[in-house]
Amino acid sequence: MSKPIRLFISSSPDLVAEREAVGQAVAGLPIAPGWEIKHTPRAGEEALEAQAFVEHCDLLLVVLGADFAAPMGLEWQGAVNAGKPVLAYCKQVLHSPAAQAALRRTQVAWTEFRFAQQLKAQVTRGLAQAVLDQGERLGLRMEDVEGLLALVKPEEQKERKPAGPDRREGAGRGGVILEGRA
């Protein structure tokens, strides 16, 4: 049996509804190994345990709201230093100077969202793809892969729709084969 996938969710303190949406997205992913999840500690909670988890997690998921508040910077740096894959989401709100600086200096593509439900859909697809990308290392079974592909494929199929009808035709009953010579 595979070990649970270790996910650390680093988030701004102002994102209560968004953290709930992320939890729903994670719970909805059809994978057998399950999850071990830790979050950014709240004010007054011990940060050392969370930081140790970050360094050994499989994925870091960052959700940025109005502020890039402590200890988000330590969580980010710990994951980057350990070479962990990062999924980054940014709420379209007025950002503090610290959040603006984080958006500028981090070397990651931020996915923007406006509402918790939009974030849930984005995290479902993004996390499904991130888990698929590491499927062998995470010990996914074929059933896990099929379930995750079903979540990712609809988006891929929309992107690849042909512009018009397919007008390719065969040679019918005849054909010519040309041998290429240089």
Features from the language model and the residues they span:
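C-terminal interaction surface of TIR/SEFIR-family domains
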Residues: 92-182
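Conserved N-terminal substructure of TIR/SEFIR domains
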Residues: 1-59, 82, 146-182
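Cross-kingdom TIR/SEFIR domain
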Residues: 23-36, 43-133
